[in-house]
Amino acid sequence: WPLISRELDRRRSRNYRGVLFADVRDTAFQSDPFGAMLTTQQIFYGFNGVESRTIGECGWNGGWIRDCFGEAKRRKLASKPIVCSGVSIATFEEGRLYAAQMAEVVSDAQFAPCERNGVDQGVHNVLMHENEVKHAVIVSQRTALVANLQAKVARVDPRSHKVANPRGDVVSVVHQYDRFPNLAAHYYETY
């Protein structure tokens, strides 16, 4: 996050319209996410992950928050939905500010003992649910143009390999496609 934050600061004067943060290992694009989502001047979109359980019901997400921010913070956020850190989309300035917030948290010496794989999602959830991210909107998997396939809400067409949300809208971004072996094989063959 410190490197991402510095890079966005460096590019601040280039008039970029938006920024997308994504896990590169398991994310694919079906269309331009910026055209569909960046329709206002200032916005930061976070997307729910698995919607069938809360932070408090999930050992991973609850554990990341507990280990990095303490049991009191985990209890405070226990009833909140899990917001996936695997894909976020924002107007440039909101994305730049978010990256700076993430960098500040993970660079703190007190954060070092809790650092491990996936812990950035705990930080992401704290920032989002504590209203620390300017102009943040949390979007449900049922209406999102980003599909988190771990949530098991999106539909994958077995013939076209297109992914759609429950409303039938073809999504712009597919995250965690490796949860569907046939879709992953299609992407590997295509790209």
Annotate each PLM feature.
Residues W1-W60, G86, R96:
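GT-A fold catalytic core of metal-dependent nucleotide-sugar glycosyltransferases
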Residues D9, K73, H129:
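Short polybasic/polar patches that bind polyanions
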Residues D26-A28, C68-A72, Q150-P158:
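Short amphipathic alpha-helical surface micro-motifs
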Residues T39-F44, C68, Y177-D178:
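Compositionally biased, intrinsically disordered low-complexity segments enriched
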Residues N61-S79:
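Short, flexible, basic/aromatic active-site loop/helix in glycosyltransferases
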Residues K76-E189:
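Catalytic core and acceptor-binding pocket of nucleotide-sugar-dependent glycosyltransferases
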